[in-house]
Regions:
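N-terminal signal peptide c-region/cleavage motif recognized by signal peptidases
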Residues: 13-15
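Short, glycine-/small- and polar/acidic-enriched structural segments
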Residues: 21-109
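Positively charged n-region of N-terminal signal peptides that target proteins for export
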Residues: 1-5
Length: 109
């Protein structure tokens, strides 16, 4: 009986699965625009969804889309106008979501 109980315990236990790893390249150093991402990382929301997210702030803010296009990152934060220009230049990029719904680019006089 003890052997059967042990067998059932091991076969009925939920399988442990490794988290999917991904790299998220920010558009600049960490700032308030990235609040939802940082909160999700700190509170463990990514981990709850089976994601192990590495967040990287670039040395050059123009690099993240290029790095994703080259396969050196999974997601990049960029600006919509820049995305249109990069696609026109032939980079294989696709917009998959919105972090900040209102553009933060403006001209002040």
């Amino acid at each position: 009986m003890r052997i059967i109980a042990t067998f059932l315990m091991f076969t009925m236990a939920a399988p442990v699965m490794a988290a999917d790893k991904m790299t998220l390249l920010l558009d600049w150093f960490v700032n308030p625009d990235h609040g939802p991402i940082i909160v999700a990382q700190e509170k463990g929301y990514f981990a709850e969804q089976g994601l192990e997210v590495e967040i990287i702030a670039p040395a050059d803010p123009a690099d993240p889309p290029k790095l994703v296009a080259a396969g050196r990152g999974d997601l990049a934060i960029s600006y919509q106008p820049s995305l249109h220009l990069q696609i026109a230049e032939g980079l294989p990029l696709k917009r998959v979501g919105t972090l900040v719904a209102t553009p933060l680019n403006c001209l002040l006089v």
